[in-house]
Amino acid sequence: MTSNPQPQPRSGASVHEYGRDFLAFSVQHGIHCVPIDDEELNRQADFYDIISRLFERRLFLPTDLTPEFVLDCGSGSGIEWAEEVMEKSELGPGSSSSEDDDFACQVVAVDIFHTEGSSPGVVKKIWNLNVAFRYDQEELARDKYDLVNSRFLADSIDASRWGAYVQDLHDRLRGGGWLQMLEAHFHFQSRSGRPLEYLSRWWNIHSQALEGHNKDPRVGTELSRYMANAGFTSISMEPKQLPVGEWHQDPRLREIGRDMKRIALQTLRSLGIWHCRRAGMQEVDFEDLIAGCEREMSDTNLQLYIPLFAIWGQRAERGQNRVDKGGSAYIPDPSRRLPPPVDWA
């Protein structure tokens, strides 16, 4: 096999810079340069809850799925989505599964860093998603999964890798399986049309830093093209406006926006501190930038929001049974060969 030009994280070694802890592998290779400390873990959990509320607690964007084997790419340090899938897949009475099984599905959660500790039913895999999946024939084997979940990887995957990455995800699915993707465009928008001095400045620094590391900060707008090129069918897209601040007329979105204001400020810190400071910004200037962003977030007349791009598509059927209910209800073929059992201990 030819040598693999992309690096893989070999340890969870960290570096302490600017008052925060970062994964050494991340900052050395320009991949998701955000902290890995408790403050960041709490932010990720809160942000996950906001996104879950925005999508009305839908774990699966294609409706009526009952996946047995799930791959979660960009699972986050706390693997919140994977854990929620497992919590909701606990076997109920009348299940035909073995008495030794605790869950109706298995989830492999992939990221470059995971916290210590085990999560029942979830296999944690350390993997740089810039590496072609052919270099792993176990958890990333072809034709293995019913559902692949990929989210918030714009600052992790090289711009030149995205087409091949989506193709890799396509090839990990069984016929009839689904891929769902979610990306955010952290260029804050204002329904008022007024200019955003500080938020736009933050975005310019952040996006230029990502582009300098061969990342595409606007990749959410390209996902449908990548999926079509990879051969997906039944492609659907659900763009969202994530409100920031308590301005929306809809009570549910108004509440989400109220809670998102605090999380958005934390997100600007987490996503921005490494890149801003590395660009030569002094601590006092960074704090002034964040304070200016906070003032703009507090102005409800601006009606701020973050664009989100949710998209999903299906790998073409290959002789498997499927119930057509809006083209999205997938039933696994009971005769198919299952992968080796996963040790959940």
Model-derived features with residue positions:
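A short glycine-rich, Lys/Arg-flanked "PGG" loop and its adjoining helix->strand segment in the class I
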Residues: 163-178
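A conserved beta-strand element that flanks and buttresses the S-adenosyl-L-methionine
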Residues: 149
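N-terminal charged/capping segments associated with class I S-adenosyl-L-methionine
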Residues: 1-143, 161, 183-211, 215, ...
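Short, well-structured beta-strand/strand-turn elements
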Residues: 233-241
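A short hydrophobic/small-residue beta-strand
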Residues: 179-180, 234
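Short catalytic micro-motifs in class I SAM-dependent methyltransferases
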Residues: 152-155
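Short alpha-helix
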Residues: 215-230
